[in-house]
Curated annotation (Swiss-Prot):
HAMAP family: PSII_Cyt550. GO terms for molecular function: electron transfer activity; heme binding; metal ion binding. InterPro entries: Cyt_c-like_dom, Cyt_c-like_dom_sf, Cytochrom_C550, PsbV_cyt_c550. Keywords: Electron transport, Heme, Iron, Membrane, Metal-binding, Photosynthesis, Photosystem II, Signal, Thylakoid, Transport. This is Photosystem II extrinsic protein V. Its main location: membrane. GO terms for cellular component: photosystem II; plasma membrane-derived thylakoid membrane.
Length: 180
């Protein structure tokens, strides 16, 4: 009974329907353009691959590096801190100051495989998680060199872009929660 009393065709004549379609299309386009800056990819800085070369990681690579870091490293390095030794962190100045410097992807990969003290004098193979002690640190067992590069890239990009990354307990980490 209602369908006979109300005719959609009569209410919206073809010209009105076209106008409605154009209006909806304009609203959808305007809505989409308004959201474009919100969903735009962040600017990812290049980081050092080696002392003489640089590399820029993709969002997908950084996402995988973050996942691997959170699985294998974040137990002791939450937010770039170093809980066993809070005087040395993963902030760029600390990575640059190590001997040898750990301020590039390949140097961090080498450190993960063969950790040494900050001054480079003593081996930490028996103490620091590494790819050789896989029975003690099973989370490192299946990491490939490519995985290690993604972890290193994630660390270096965070050190360059995240306020408070690698800060000590006395420094503010109020902005870090968005990045973890």
């Amino acid at each position: 009974m209602f369908s006979k009393a109300f005719s959609f065709q009569k209410v919206f004549a073809p010209a009105r329907r076209r106008l409605l379609v154009l209006l909806l299309a304009a609203l959808m386009a305007g809505f989409g353009w308004g959201l474009a800056p919100v969903f735009a990819a962040r600017d990812i800085p290049a980081v050092a691959l080696s002392p003489t070369e640089s590399i820029t990681f993709t969002e997908a690579q950084l996402a995988k590096g973050k996942k691997l870091f959170n699985t294998a490293c974040a137990q002791c390095h939450v937010g770039g801190q170093t809980y066993p030794n809070p005087d040395v962190s993963l902030k760029l100045s600390d990575l640059e100051g190590a001997t040898p410097p750990r301020d590039n992807v390949l140097a961090i990969v080498d450190y993960i495989k063969n950790p040494v003290t900050y001054d480079g004098v003593e081996s930490l193979l028996e103490y620091h998680p590494n790819t050789q002690l896989t029975s003690e640190y099973p989370r490192l067992r299946n990491l490939t060199d490519e995985d290690l590069k993604l972890i290193a890239g994630y660390i270096l990009v965070q050190a360059k872009t995240v306020p408070g990354w690698g800060g000590t307990k006395n420094e503010s980490h109020s902005d870090l929660s968005a990045y973890l």
